[in-house]
Structure formats: C-alpha cells, structure tokens
Amino acid sequence: MYNHRWKTAARIFVTAWFLIGGVMHFVNPEPFVRIMPPYIPFHLACVYISGAFELAGAIGLWIKPLRNLAGYGLMVLTAVVTLANIHMYQHPDLFPNIPEWLLLVRFPVQAILIWLIWWCSRPEKTATVKP
C-alpha cells in the first residue's frame, strides 16, 4: 500500500511533466525547434510529433493495459530528447539566457526522469498465497 502511494505520486508527476511539455510543443513550438541539433531534419514536424507522443504517453500511463507500453515509449522519447540536451551543452553560446551549469544538470535530471517513468509504469506486485 505504501509503495502504491509513491508510485501513484510518481505517475502524477511524470504525467504532469509530459502533459505540460506536450501541450507546450503545440502552443509555443519555437523554443523546442531552437534546441534541436541541425543534423535532425524537419524540426517543426519533429516537435509536433514528439509533443503528440508526450501527450499520448502521459495519458497511457493511466490506462492499465497501456501503462507498460506508454512507459517504454516515454523512456525512449526522453532518451531521444537527450540529443537536444547534448546540442545545447555543446553550444552554450546559442542559449545565452541559460546558465551552463543548468545545461549540465539536465543530464542527471533526464536519467532520474527515465528511472521514474520506468518505476511508475511497472505493474504492481500482487501478493500470492502459497497453498
């Protein structure tokens, strides 16, 4: 029961993170376009697609038959977003309003987020009765 509450809290946090982020991909896509590495084509389309996947994953975390799949999808998406974080860290001059230390902190935050996604999307363990 105690573990269930923490998992639910983690799922709420992850859902909020991706719902807000996903909506912002459509409401204000420009910042997301700006952080994309130049070697990735179709920046705006990628922003819209990733926003849609963020929204779908956030919703999927609350649908039990889809929870595991949604978790894997959000983990992959978060890992792919790391490409933008690497680009930002390698080119801090392109992002003068963001302190360099904050660009670096994004990497452990991404790792923690991936772990949270994994943990909150795993099935609950049920007690088994031995005969």
Task: Give residue spans per PLM region.
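Membrane-interface extramembranous regions
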Residues: 1-131
